[in-house]
């Protein structure tokens, strides 16, 4: 469960906007996170990332099978994020 507030701003080279929703789970090693990025131009993107000791980690997202249930539980609190993720498996 993330302690970071949403929405909060982000600024990338190709656009800026807000992190509209976020689902994460704390593990012994890092905090796997899925974010809904809502750009100022109205477009939306998913970001699969991780945090380490509270800081954004520049590494690929790796989620152990034993943490998927907890991450799924957190995703239930983020309806827009779930809607986009369903497009990956439907």
Regions inferred by a protein language model and the residue ranges of each:
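A short, structured beta-strand/loop element
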Residues: 28-59
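Intrinsically disordered, low-complexity segments enriched in small/polar residues
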Residues: 13-15, 40, 62
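Mixed-charge, Lys/Arg-enriched low-complexity segments
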Residues: 2-3, 7-10, 52-90
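Compositionally biased, intrinsically disordered low-complexity segments
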Residues: 21-22, 37, 66
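Negatively charged, low-complexity tracts enriched in Asp/Glu with abundant Ser/Thr
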Residues: 1-29
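Intrinsically disordered, low-complexity regions
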Residues: 16-18, 43, 55, 65
């Amino acid at each position: 469960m993330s302690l970071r507030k949403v929405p909060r701003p982000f600024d990338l080279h190709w656009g800026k906007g807000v992190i509209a929703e976020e689902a994460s789970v704390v593990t012994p090693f890092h905090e796997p996170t899925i974010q809904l990025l809502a750009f100022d131009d109205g477009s939306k993107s998913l970001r699969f990332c991780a945090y380490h000791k509270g800081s954004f980690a520049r590494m690929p997202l790796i989620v152990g099978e034993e943490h998927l249930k907890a991450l799924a539980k957190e995703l239930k609190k983020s309806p827009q994020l779930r809607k986009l993720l369903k497009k990956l498996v439907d």
